[in-house]
From Swiss-Prot:
No toxicity is observed upon intravenous or intracerebroventricular injection into mice. Has no cytotoxic activity towards C2C12 cells at 100 ug/ml. GO terms for molecular function: toxin activity. Belongs to the three-finger toxin family. Short-chain subfamily. Expressed by the venom gland. The keyword Cell cycle does not apply. It comes from the Eukaryota. GO terms for cellular component: extracellular region. This is Clarkitoxin-I-Mdum. Disulfide bonds join C3-C24, C17-C42, C46-C59, C60-C65. It is found in: Secreted. It holds the Pfam family Toxin_cobra-type.
């Protein structure tokens, strides 16, 4: 799988994911002034938000999908 791992919105830096990490994800803070703190990368499954929902989490299973 190839996923973007840039933490900067609108910047794409594709990376080859390690074996077993077949999900691309993006975690973006819900509070708009912190959107630049997003995190993108590879995972073995879609990450979950904690008890207090502070992130919008998107996941997909195709190359460069987020």
């Amino acid at each position: 799988r190839i996923c973007d791992d840039s933490s900067i919105p609108f910047l794409r830096t594709p990376q080859l994911c390690p074996k077993g990490q077949d999900v691309c994800y993006k975690k973006t803070p819900i509070v708009k002034k912190f959107k630049w703190l997003q995190k993108k990368g590879c995972a073995s499954s879609c990450p979950k938000d904690g008890f207090i929902k502070i992130f919008k989490i998107e996941c997909c299973t195709k190359d460069n999908c987020i």
